[in-house]
């Protein structure tokens, strides 16, 4: 996985995002709530380990 890849959180298949930073963890800034409903206050910035993410589209 690299910056710009589209990923999905394995434990919650409805939650997906774009990798914005490449470090030990992947930084997800948007999820399905923000993209579909437009409520940025609900879309928290979260950190995930690589093993918790499924790669949907690689750049």
Protein language model regions, located:
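Basic/aromatic-rich interaction segments and small domains that mediate binding to polyanionic partners
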Residues: 2-57
């Amino acid at each position: 996985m690299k910056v710009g890849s589209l990923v999905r959180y394995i434990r919650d298949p409805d939650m997906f995002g774009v990798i914005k930073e490449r470090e030990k963890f992947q930084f997800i800034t948007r999820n399905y709530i923000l993209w579909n409903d437009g409520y940025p206050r609900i879309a928290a910035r979260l950190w995930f380990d690589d093993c918790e993410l499924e790669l949907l589209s690689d750049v």
